[in-house]
Amino acid sequence: MAAKEVIFGDAARAKMVEGVNVLANAVKVTLGPKGRNVVLERSFGAPTVTKDGVSVAKEIELKDKLQNMGAQLVKEVASRTSDNAGDGTTTATVLAQAIVREGMKYVAAGMNPMDLKRGIDKAVAATVEQLAAIAKPCTTTKEIAQVGSISANSDASIGERIAEAMEKVGKEGVITVEDGKSLNDELDIVEGMQFDRGYLSPYFINNPEKQTAILENPFILLCDKKISNIRDLLPVLEQVAKAGRPLLIIAEDIEGEALATLVVNNIRGILKTCAVKAPGFGDRRKAMLEDIAILSGGQVVAEEVGLTLEKITLEELGQAKRIEIGKENTTLIDGNGQAVTIEARVKQIRAQIEEATSDYDREKLQERVAKLAGGVAVIKVGAATEVEMKEKKARVEDALHATRAAVEEGIVPGGGVALLRARAAIKIKGDNPDQEAGIRIVLRAMEEPLRMIVQNAGEEASVVVAKVLEGKGNFGYNAANGTYGDMVEMGVLDPAKVTRSALQNAASIAALLLTTDCMVAEVAEDKAAGGMGDMGGMGGMGGMGGMM
């Protein structure tokens, strides 16, 4: 085991803060409508240009192990916020840095870090309550477009595309983002269905870049039993191979020699296949399989209907124009089902929703209706170059996450105003002076997102913050055009979920940093350049001349 270096107290915290600052300073330049780009080196190909906080954070790895620990903890803030809300990663990083910076002053002054943490937690809980009170539902297409535009770095066309997609497929529908073929963004609405099961083996992947298996014009075999014996599958595999089309198998499970044979056939190119577990459990699984059968115009192989794998023909298999299978999701696009049958199935499920007694059952039934009736919207991102397309695609994905978050928990005024208004309404007290200091740390940190937005726009932060604090309600500063006014009317909106997640995750990690008193890291080994030094003995080789 390698020797470890152990550092205590202020020395440990100072190193960690250095790491926090390096990462946060790199990320926060991207904040706001006038935020700058960050260029990331790639080991091959063109560098990536991004304004996405979490993409920048993930690239940073510091040489100094102690500094790197601090940087990695703040990276966790960005990653967790991205996972929870899909956006707000830069805001979360800015808040974390501010809480750490303010908190370290109090720790250095001798205050109890644990009480500071309790104060921070109290202030965050109170702020979350205030944000929920400020938030208003996001219902109109215009509001959805505004949220999308802000999240896509003030690109109105992206916001409009997302709002249009949501309007077409409903808030429950599936929206995916793809590379476009032209210079402009396009929106395609495709009838389809998505369920949360992915490929059973990574050997089915045929698109390494997206890590997905894509089947064009496939047959679909639906079975409500476990398949482990390849002999059961042989008749249907032979029929599909003769037809020269791919096959997707959706069953309770596929294992053993059946799965191995499918994988081998796929790798050798004899038969393009993919195997997926059926979604849901128990009765819900049977119902979901029936939904897929109706959508694809096939039949479920089940004992109840007298169908077995040996007897099934191509006519009883479902069909679709295209199927995309990822690690966790399968999207079935343009199934071969009859519109009348699908409509009848939707009516049947809606009747079940009326009779459902539990909220959980109702929610699951509504999901099924959305999957049958909603369809899939595909936003095709257009750009002049591949580098621009990658950057734009990342922004579209961010904006999509933000709009979903807005629909879920409502919207608050953007541009850092929501945190300032929530701060003004907080009237809590700590149990002792150290907890009071913890509350003050959070209240001060809540100014930081606005300060950073203003700074990136090239204005004087203190002047703008003071003016915004004088105002009330939605009054704030629009950095895009340098004007003051009602943020909601100007269309500068943030999803409440994004602001809440950013603050909670930032405070959680920052409080851990403040309460750290010891760091343990491997001692860096001096890699001596030696080894070649003994070659001096080779001088005797001169005598080799006599060999001639």
Swiss-Prot record:
Source superkingdom: Bacteria
Keywords attached to this entry: ATP-binding, Chaperone, Cytoplasm, Isomerase, Nucleotide-binding
EC code: 5.6.1.7
Alphabetized GO MF terms: ATP binding; ATP-dependent protein folding chaperone; isomerase activity; unfolded protein binding
Location, primary (coarse class): cytoplasm
InterPro entries listed in its UniProt record: Chaperonin_Cpn60_CS (IPR018370), Cpn60/GroEL (IPR001844), Cpn60/GroEL/TCP-1 (IPR002423), GroEL-like_apical_dom_sf (IPR027409), GROEL-like_equatorial_sf (IPR027413), TCP-1-like_intermed_sf (IPR027410)
Protein family according to the UniProt entry: Belongs to the chaperonin (HSP60) family.
Job of this protein: Together with its co-chaperonin GroES, plays an essential role in assisting protein folding. The GroEL-GroES system forms a nano-cage that allows encapsulation of the non-native substrate proteins and provides a physical environment optimized to promote and accelerate protein folding.
Self-association and partners: Forms a cylinder of 14 subunits composed of two heptameric rings stacked back-to-back. Interacts with the co-chaperonin GroES.
Name by which UniProt lists this protein: Chaperonin GroEL
Designated gene of the protein: groEL
